[in-house]
From Swiss-Prot:
Gene source species: Caenorhabditis elegans
Localization (cell): Cell membrane
Entry protein name: Protein tweety homolog 1
Gene coding for it: ttyh-1
TM annotation in the entry: 43-63, 83-103, 218-238, 246-266, 396-416
Coiled coil feature spans: none
């Protein structure tokens, strides 16, 4: 038992239940109203129900995590580092499962490519075979015309001979040859009418398989690539311990999780259907192939040999009618030579018939060669090998890997919610300043920086180093003498009815400035 056959038997154990939850015996009937299609729909609904349950679990955990009070006491570096390590390990496992999914996808694509190429080769060989059979049938029709001329000539020449017994034998042999040639011509027409659309059926199967496989392969590659990019973004956020990156990954990862589980819900019934086709697909194969089904079954089970006698039954019967004609033609020539003494008319008509029979013998050999078992056997076997061996194994590996990927994504989304309060918001990235920045000019000495760079020179230490006189805003009375106020020469005017303004501290060294207070 091969690995593929083991998988096919394993999938057969899965119950096929209709919408009434009754076991159905309908196998691989893809009609919309069939019970088998209902069974596949229930399997898809089962996968969707599991995914919905996991989604509800994630949402509940996220709500609880969002409502949880942020306690900074437990926010230690060790815990953050440990959580980042766990997320990194889960992400690596997800990457590994994605790689296995891509490998399985390529494995299925290779198997389907083998099947499609076998259909193409079978179609080409079948076209050659049918062309040889058509030429064989046309040669039989031409031979029938020449046999009719020979019969007319024999009837005319028989009136000149007196040997009635030989003439009667000639008529009998000629009738036998004519009947056999007529049967060959009629069988050729019947064969063409019966198998005339076989090429179209093969081409239709090739187009359907090519379209399905190309779309399936491209769809999975795009989705898995997007999932890989999202996971890579999450890994970067985990390594940088970025709160914003973790939140963004949670949002995008939620949709990726939904997509992965939708793929699981769709892929599982398709895998079961493929296994059922390989195990019990004769009914649908017979329906789609029609008259070609028996021929395909023959080439699938025949043993290829170097001889040309291993042919399908319709072709073998068609060619076997020619076996007795050469011997009958030789006997006919001997009798006509004796009866008609090598008459020119008889010789010419007999030569034309002989040429036609020789041509038919050559075409019969061509039909046997182009329709023999060794011509089609490998292509038919490769079709079953690519579909029921490589594709089944690839789909099984893909199902296992994407199921594990869905589980790991579920765990990842649960764990990543714990980082919302543990990871800190990273500062903005460093921005390079240009040459016009007044706070950090490039290539300029600090002495050229304006004093009022801060908007005011208050509390600016550079003000003290300037040569301008101080305004006493930063150093108080640094430039004034340290004499007490009562020791200074101050005059007080007498009290009068009219107050006159007198310069205050007129003898002060700073009286040449505009800051004066008059009383």
């Amino acid at each position: 038992m091969t690995f593929a056959s083991f998988l096919i038997n394993f999938y057969s154990v899965i119950p096929r239940l209709n919408f009434k939850f009754h076991w159905t015996n309908d196998v691989f009937n893809l009609e919309w109203s069939s019970e088998y299609f209902q069974a596949l729909a229930l399997v898809a609904c089962l996968g969707a129900a599991v995914s919905l349950l996991l989604l509800v679990t994630i949402i509940i955990v996220w709500i609880c995590q969002a409502c949880h009070k942020n306690e900074t006491t437990g926010k230690t570096r060790r815990r953050v580092r440990r959580l980042s390590t766990v997320l990194f390990i889960i992400s690596v496992l997800c990457f590994f499962m994605l790689g296995v999914c891509l490998f399985a996808n390529e494995h299925v694509n290779r198997g389907m490519s083998i099947s499609i190429n076998s259909i193409i080769n079978t179609k080409k060989s079948y076209q050659i075979s049918t062309a040889q059979i058509s030429q064989f049938q046309e040669a039989a029709l031409n031979t029938t015309v020449h046999l009719k001329n020979l019969e007319d000539t024999v009837h005319v020449e028989s009136k000149k001979t007196k040997n009635a017994t030989i003439v009667q034998q000639i008529d009998q042999i000629l009738t036998n040859i004519t009947d056999e040639i007529d049967i060959i011509a009629k069988n050729g027409k019947l064969f063409q009418a019966k198998h005339g659309d076989d090429i179209g059926k093969l081409e239709k199967i090739r187009k359907v398989l090519s379209l399905y496989e190309s779309e399936r392969w491209a769809f999975l590659v795009i989705l898995l690539s997007i999932t890989m990019v999202v996971l890579f973004t999450g890994v970067v956020a985990f390594c940088k311990q970025s709160k914003k990156g973790a939140v963004v990954f949670s949002a995008i990862g939620f949709f990726i999780f939904v997509v992965v589980w939708l793929l699981i819900s769709i892929s599982l019934p398709l895998t079961i259907a493929l296994a059922d086709f390989c195990r019990d697909g004769d009914q649908v194969t017979r329906k789609n192939l029609g008259n070609l089904y028996e021929t395909v079954q023959f080439y699938n089970t025949c043993v290829p040999v170097t001889t040309h006698d291993n042919l399908p039954l319709p072709v073998a019967r068609h060619v076997a009618l020619l076996n007795n004609i050469p011997a009958n033609k030789s006997q006919l020539d001997r009798l006509m030579e004796v009866a008609f003494n090598s008459s020119a008319a008889i010789v010419n008509s007999s030569s034309a018939v002989g040429d036609d029979i020789t041509k038919m013998l050559k075409l019969a050999g061509a039909v046997s060669s182009s329709s023999s078992c060794y011509v089609f056997h490998d292509d038919v076997v490769n079709f079953y090998y690519g579909t029921c061996n490589q594709s089944v194994a690839g789909m099984s590996i893909y199902m296992l890997s994407i199921l594990l990927l869905g589980v790991f994504l579920f765990i990842l989304l649960i764990v990543v919610s714990k980082t919302w309060n543990l990871f800190s918001r990273l500062p903005n990235e460093y921005t390079e300043v240009d040459e016009d920045d007044p706070f950090f000019p490039r290539g300029v000495n600090d002495s050229t920086i304006p004093v009022d760079i801060y908007g005011t020179h208050v509390y600016n230490p550079r003000t003290r180093d300037r040569t301008e006189p101080s305004t006493n805003t930063t150093s108080g009375t640094a430039d004034e003498p340290n004499a007490p106020l009562w020791s200074q020469n101050v005059t007080v005017p007498l009290v009068s009815n009219s107050m006159s303004r007198q310069p205050f501290m007129s003898d002060h060294p700073y009286n040449n400035y505009e800051d004066r207070y008059n009383m």
